[in-house]
């Protein structure tokens, strides 16, 4: 933990990082190839840099200088960061729209035989926050993509249903399905993790699924923050008289019940990879609506004010203990993990994304003459 010597906030958006961590891990550790290009949502920058650190593409010194001069950037930046940032991202959803136009440009260069030798066609990917759907340029890009029949494009929505402005409207997901479907996208909803899917097949399972589907976003977030006893109280009250309810609740202690009720697909690696594999096609753009929890696994999870919140030193100490990371091991790549370090190193060396070295390609410079000659005529028009 870096001290705040002047009392000002130091650190990023921890809750936003937590909601996107599994999605980014699935992308960079499995789904992506070196030729793919990704726009990472700006508030998930620390997760991106951590993945690059694991892959040996980021230094400890720059990580420790996060948000400081010369350190890794709070928003991914192609000009200020030194690692594999494909698109600079920031406010108003510009990174999201850029991926769509990058896909169109790639199609153009291929169609005109202008792709450089040895450069393979890649997929364009954007990991976006649900609040980025408030930005008009995202919808302008959607319409342009429909006009040009864009393909080979993934937009992954980190649907944690919380933003700086408050809790997302209950029915936003239906609108997402409508307007993406209207633009000829394939919409894939990732809502339930494998534990919840298994519970739905057991005692009171159908009633449990209906309760989750009907639970308002603000209540779900509040229960996520309060934990197991709060889940139990609400389920007992709301599902009173449901056959099998006692059997369902009695089979989980408070911690286990909380784990079950927060098992959303956006935090379930198996569910995410299944969806990515099933959508591995180029001819149609793909929209993944991944249900997540803002602050997942943190003491801030679900809290209404967690957008820019930071864990206190005491909370961070408890978090490190929970993750089995001892003092002094914070920068050990495999701290807290029970797997053999050699196996983990071998895995990282075989990650498809990192299979080749340099991912940046420099185009030849276009010569610009010192002076543009013009031929004056008696009559000229400004309209062409």
State where each predicted segment sits.
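Long, well-ordered, tryptophan-enriched scaffold segments
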Residues: 159-377
């Amino acid at each position: 933990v870096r001290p705040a010597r002047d009392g000002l906030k130091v650190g990023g958006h921890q809750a936003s990082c937590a909601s996107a961590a599994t999605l980014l891990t699935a992308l960079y550790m499995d789904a992506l190839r070196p030729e793919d290009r990704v726009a990472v949502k700006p508030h998930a920058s620390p997760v991106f840099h951590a993945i690059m650190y694991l892959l040996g593409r980021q230094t400890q010194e720059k990580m420790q200088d996060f948000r400081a001069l010369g350190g890794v950037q709070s928003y991914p930046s192609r000009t200020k960061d030194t690692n594999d940032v494909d698109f600079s991202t920031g406010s108003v959803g510009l990174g999201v729209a850029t991926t769509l136009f990058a896909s169109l440009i790639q199609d153009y260069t291929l169609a005109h035989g202008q792709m450089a030798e040895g450069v393979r066609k890649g997929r364009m990917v954007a990991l976006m926050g649900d609040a980025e759907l408030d930005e008009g340029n995202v919808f302008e890009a959607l319409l342009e993509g429909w006009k040009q029949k864009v393909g080979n494009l993934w937009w992954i929505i980190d649907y944690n249903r919380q933003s700086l402005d408050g809790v997302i409207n209950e029915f936003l997901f239906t609108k997402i399905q409508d307007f993406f479907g209207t633009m000829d996208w394939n919409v894939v909803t990732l809502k339930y993790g494998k534990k919840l899917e298994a519970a739905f097949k057991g005692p009171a399972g159908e009633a449990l699924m209906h309760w989750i589907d009907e639970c308002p976003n603000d209540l779900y977030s509040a229960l996520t923050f309060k934990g197991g006893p709060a889940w139990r109280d609400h389920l007992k009250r709301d599902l009173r008289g449901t056959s099998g309810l006692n059997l369902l609740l009695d089979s989980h202690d408070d911690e286990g019940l909380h784990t079950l009720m927060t098992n959303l697909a956006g935090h379930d690696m198996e569910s995410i990879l299944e969806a990515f594999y099933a959508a591995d096609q180029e001819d149609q753009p793909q929209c993944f609506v991944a249900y997540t929890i803002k602050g997942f696994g943190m003491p801030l999870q679900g809290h209404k004010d967690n957008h820019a919140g930071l864990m206190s030193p005491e909370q961070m100490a408890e978090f490190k203990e929970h993750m089995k990371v001892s003092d002094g091991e914070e920068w050990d790549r495999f701290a807290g993990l029970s797997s053999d370090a050699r196996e983990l190193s071998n895995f990282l060396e075989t990650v498809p994304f990192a299979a080749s070295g340099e991912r940046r390609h420099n185009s030849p410079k276009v010569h610009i003459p010192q002076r543009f000659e013009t031929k004056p005529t008696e009559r000229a028009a400004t309209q062409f």
